[in-house]
Design a protein with these regions (language model features):
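Bacterial Sec-dependent N-terminal signal peptides
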Residues: 3-42, 149-154
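Tryptophan-anchored aromatic micro-motifs
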Residues: 40-63
Length: 154
């Protein structure tokens, strides 16, 4: 009696393994450097001028930095970090499609953010955000104008 054992090695499946890429291949187990990442030029740190109208119709002006980075495994998705100069306490997610910045309705750290649209122009972004505060539900209207100061490469 002769036993022959034949094992099959799994063939490497080459493709894009970066889930943020337009051409992500979930079945690929070996990256072939073919990944196509969009909106890379929009990622980075922005110096922001923030004019905010509070519930009493008073306007406040603030200057601070906002970081725009990729949202996990969503080729159009982004996260805006430090909106309102609140660090990681207020992170707003959205999408970039062409020059458009699309922010869906969402909750972030108790803040209710209403759906809105903004846009990018060269190295700047512009967006108006309406939100309600966590405890009292006070309405605020925020106009953000950001100019890129640092690129993020990813």
């Amino acid at each position: 009696m002769i036993l022959i054992w034949v094992g099959c090695a799994e063939e490497p499946l080459r493709g894009c393994t970066n889930c943020n890429a337009v051409n992500f291949n979930e079945y690929a187990n070996e990256d072939d450097d073919s990944c196509i990442l969009i909106n890379t030029a929009r990622l980075g740190e922005y110096a922001v001028m923030d004019s905010t109208m509070d519930w009493s119709m008073t306007w406040w002006i603030y200057d601070y930095n906002v970081t725009i980075e990729r949202d996990s495994c969503n080729y159009e998705g982004i996260k805006m970090i430090n909106v309102g100069n609140k660090g990681n306490d207020l992170i707003i997610t959205g999408k970039i499609i062409g020059d458009s910045l699309i922010i869906p309705s969402q909750f972030s750290s108790g803040y209710e953010i209403f759906e809105t649209n903004g846009y990018f122009l060269n190295d700047s972004f512009f967006v108006q955000i309406m939100y309600l505060t966590p405890i009292f539900g006070d309405a605020y209207l925020k106009n953000l104008k950001g100019k890129k100061i640092i690129n993020i490469l990813n």
